[in-house]
């Protein structure tokens, strides 16, 4: 085995270990697993956003930034802003956006501290406990008419304007559309 092959193998092993640790730490620190939105579901979420091309689009808990990258690819005029609390996942999102040459802002921050007052559209895939906290935050910060699309989990005190089921595997993923 050549020295280059050994170095490459070492890097691959380190990346696999880092990714595994990221999943464990994400679960232990944030009390939620890192679960990326399937691309089929992401495409439906972007469709439900009814983007015109000039909006400020946020993804709170953006993970690898796939929703923002997809939205930006389909609507280049939008301003895409994401927040991700876990540093290694944030780095993954930054790298993905860089590799795909997708100009977007990705903040390493908690969804509850992100300023969403100028948002036109917000994407969410967060746990039920966070949905309750975000509902209060949105009531205080969002301007009228903001569209919020949530993957899997509804807001506890708000009725969606639309519910959509997306076939996934042997079942369905539910999407909830809200207007503030």
What are the language-model segments listed below?
Residues 79-84:
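Conserved SAM-binding motif I beta-strand of class I
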Residues 130-180:
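C-terminal substrate-binding/active-site "lid" region of AdoMet-derived donor-dependent transferases
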């Amino acid at each position: 085995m050549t020295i280059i092959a050994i170095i490459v193998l070492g890097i691959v092993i380190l990346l696999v270990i880092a990714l595994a640790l990221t999943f464990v730490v994400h679960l232990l620190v944030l009390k939620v697993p890192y679960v990326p939105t399937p691309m089929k579901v992401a495409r439906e979420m972007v469709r439900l956003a009814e983007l015109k091309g000039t909006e400020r689009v946020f993804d709170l808990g953006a993970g690898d930034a796939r929703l923002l990258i997809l939205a930006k690819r389909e609507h280049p005029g939008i301003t895409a802003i994401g927040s991700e609390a876990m540093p290694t996942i944030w780095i993954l999102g930054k790298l993905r956006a860089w590799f795909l040459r997708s100009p977007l802002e990705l903040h390493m921050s908690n969804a509850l501290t992100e300023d969403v007052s100028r948002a036109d559209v917000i994407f969410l895939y967060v746990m039920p406990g966070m949905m309750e906290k975000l509902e209060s935050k949105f009531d205080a910060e969002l301007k009228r008419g903001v569209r919020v699309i949530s993957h899997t989990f509804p807001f506890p005190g708000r009725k969606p304007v639309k519910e959509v089921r997306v076939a996934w595997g042997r079942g369905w993923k539910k999407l909830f559309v809200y207007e503030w």
